Design a protein with these regions (language model features):
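GH16 jelly-roll
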Residues: 1-173
Length: 173
């Protein structure tokens, strides 16, 4: 399902225009383009994005994505997992991959009520980075266990986010 435009930083340029979406050689291609063609749309940029909400629920195991992401100033490609029912940030967010601009690294992050609302981001650390080759396809993964999330890029460990014993609310997504 195509992501509709919203008002958040991450979705304020989303569009339904076909120029932002393509299937080619078995690959889904999502584009971010300057808006020179949609005169009735005031957004300076148009981007394609997809939701898989309601299509697949992961309760454990490995989620792995192979993707090639071109660099551009202002680019913020991301692959996230959100809970099926709980609202953000109560239900948490698992960022399998985020990349900014021309970075040669990928960010992998765990967000939750604990990290976002309570602001506890270092006990345990809630994110890590790993090198990528931007000119190639890279493999981004998270292994979901009852007691931890284990992140990797190209089969190289990035970091592990453990479930810890705490009296604070919402530590583990």
């Amino acid at each position: 399902t195509k992501i509709p435009r919203g008002t958040s930083d991450w979705n304020n340029y989303m569009s339904y225009y076909d120029s932002c979406y393509a299937m080619q050689d078995g690959n889904l291609i999502l584009r971010g383009i300057a808006n020179h063609t949609q005169k009735n749309d005031t957004a300076p940029y148009l981007t394609g994005g997809v939701y898989t909400k309601g299509k697949k629920l992961f309760t454990g195991g490995r989620v792995e994505i192979r993707a090639k992401l071109q660099a551009a100033k202002g680019a913020w490609p991301a692959i996230w997992m959100l809970p099926e029912k709980a609202e953000w940030p109560k239900g948490g967010e698992i960022d399998i991959m985020e990349r900014l601009n021309h970075d040669r690294i990928a960010y992998q992050t765990t967000h939750s009520y604990y990290t976002h609302v309570l602001g506890i981001k270092d006990n345990p650390p809630h994110g890590g980075i790993n090198k990528i080759n931007p000119e190639e396809y890279n493999i981004y993964s998270v292994d979901i266990y009852p007691d931890s999330l284990v992140f990797a890029v190209n089969h190289r460990h990035t970091y592990t986010y453990p479930r810890i014993d705490t009296d604070k609310e919402g530590q583990f997504p």
